[in-house]
Amino acid sequence: MAKNIPFKLILEKAKDYQADMTRFLRDMVAIPSESCDEKRVVHRIKEEMEKVGFDKVEIDPMGNVLGYIGHGPRLVAMDAHIDTVGIGNIKNWDFDPYEGMETDELIGGRGTSDQEGGMASMVYAGKIIKDLGLEDEYTLLVTGTVQEEDCDGLCWQYIIEQSGIRPEFVVSTEPTDCQVYRGQRGRMEIRIDVQGVSCHGSAPERGDNAIFKMGPILGELQELSQRLGYDEFLGKGTLTVSEIFFTSPSRCAVADSCAVSIDRRLTWGETWEGALDEIRALPAVQKANAVVSMYNYDRPSWTGLVYPTECYFPTWKVEEDHFTVKALVNAYEGLFGKAPVVDKWTFSTNGVSIMGRHGIPVIGFGPGKEPEAHAPNEKTWKSHLVTCAAMYAAIPLSWLATE
């Protein structure tokens, strides 16, 4: 039987640690940490975990930082990816994205919402658990994972497949505006290649223009995007052309190849095989003898480890009556005296591997808001850090009590 959950004390402690979480988050933001360059921020997180009293902290061969609280037989994990995207056009920022900014309510900087704020709240949730003696028949694993922005879920493929770590469920701390999120659409990265024959541009009839051959394909892709699958909860599948490439001997020549990249979002019931086949079936694709394929990812992590995978990120969701939803709803109601909003992400998370590939339930609750992700002047809310730290401290006991 789980311990009684001291919700009031947990929330008071979370409020007490607002300044510490703010400082720690700003420290992380000040360290540029794009995918495959996370070494410094990983070591900064390890330092903070050790400072607040985690029982064990280690960095795995891929470069993920793993912190443990407790020694119980049942394992629950909470995850934050700690890499960020770049800053884009610096002229679009009103403040330095790494120096950041701070007001009484806000913290600004690259990674504040997406998603180093989640890490700040998790680390101090660990301290709250230690302060209040909330350890029970569980072990809490807090992960700071790498390369998510490059290849979402690859870090957890490694953790599960190579390290043999398999929690009973995982809380994703991606931004949810302090709502409970229970699913997301999947995605895949598709490429279409068309071949042509070059010749001098003064007599184009002698060649076979690959760009012209791609034109009808683009039109049919746009039409296909209007008739993709639909799910009542996750919404519709989508398709957009995100990149276009060509080769040509010169600007005075016919292009001899053309390729496009496609960002395909998969709703419930859609498969990677079906997504490729529906493109291969397009008349313009067949007429051009185009090759339709899926991208692969094999970029080394900051430690030099290569863990290749195909660029397919499965759709996932848990049902409203799932134990993970109940555990988070009960924790939220105990802390705040009202029911949380239960919804879904628009973007993708590490859940694509944790649940999408490996069937380990995932549930989301995080500080910050989705529209802040990858945007200039990114920010998060200090109150969100407090709310999430309290939730993360209460969730393990709420889970044990829910069963």
From Swiss-Prot:
Binds 2 Zn(2+) or Co(2+) ions per subunit. Zn(2+) 1 binds at residues 81, 114, 174. This is Uncharacterized protein YgeY. Keywords: Cobalt, Hydrolase, Metal-binding, Metalloprotease, Protease, Zinc. The gene is ygeY. GO terms for biological process: L-arginine biosynthetic process; proteolysis. One of its GO terms (molecular function) is metallopeptidase activity. The lineage of its organism: Bacteria, Pseudomonadati, Pseudomonadota, Gammaproteobacteria, Enterobacterales. Its cofactor is Zn(2+); Co(2+). The active site is at residues 83, 148. InterPro entries: ArgE/DapE_CS, Bact_exopeptidase_dim_dom, Peptidase_M20, Peptidase_M20/DapE_YgeY, Peptidase_M20_dimer, Peptidase_M20A. It comes from Escherichia coli (strain K12). Pfam families: M20_dimer, Peptidase_M20. Belongs to the peptidase M20A family. Zn(2+) 2 binds at residues 114, 149, 374.
